[in-house]
């Protein structure tokens, strides 16, 4: 049986890393607002963030729930740049991304999709969560169509 993957944001990043390390995996991966440039999100910390990292060895950010990010985690992200590490394999990958994503640069999603010949569905006006009226339903319908059809 083929495995189906669904990843959103950081989960999509992890899915792509996994598929890069296991190119023999045959399945379908649908990625919503994929954090394809995860390593750059923490490249330019604010003065307060840099101070916290230097003093405590970590910082707390709030993405709905508090997340503790260690210096090691930030370094690991830099070492796992998908633009360098991703290797297309047997899996069929599709991405969906909002054109107004405030967290993950939409242009980077385009660059990634073009570099690796991945289908990218653009949701015009969509934010990172693709949360405006009708967008969650559009994501579900697009994913279902992708998974159920060859």
Task: Go through each PLM region and give its residues.
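Conserved acidic catalytic loop of the alpha/beta-hydrolase fold
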Residues: 1-2
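The alpha/beta-hydrolase serine catalytic core
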Residues: 25-111, 115-122, 127-130, 134-140, ...
């Amino acid at each position: 049986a083929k495995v189906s993957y669904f990843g959103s944001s950081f989960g999509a990043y992890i899915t792509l890393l996994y598929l890069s390390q296991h190119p023999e995996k045959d399945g379908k991966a649908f990625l919503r607002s994929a954090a394809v440039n995860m390593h750059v999100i923490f490249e330019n910390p604010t003065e307060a963030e840099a101070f916290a990292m230097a003093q405590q060895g970590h910082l707390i950010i709030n993405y709905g729930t508090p997340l503790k990010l260690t210096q090691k985690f930030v370094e690991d992200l830099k070492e796992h740049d998908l633009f360098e590490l991703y290797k297309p394999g047997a899996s069929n990958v599709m991405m969906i991304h909002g054109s107004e994503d405030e967290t993950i640069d939409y242009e980077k999603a385009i660059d990634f999709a073009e570099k690796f010949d991945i289908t990218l569905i653009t949701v015009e006006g969509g934010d990172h969560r693709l949360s405006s009226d009708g967008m969650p339903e559009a994501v579900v319908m697009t994913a279902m169509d992708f998974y159920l059809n060859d």
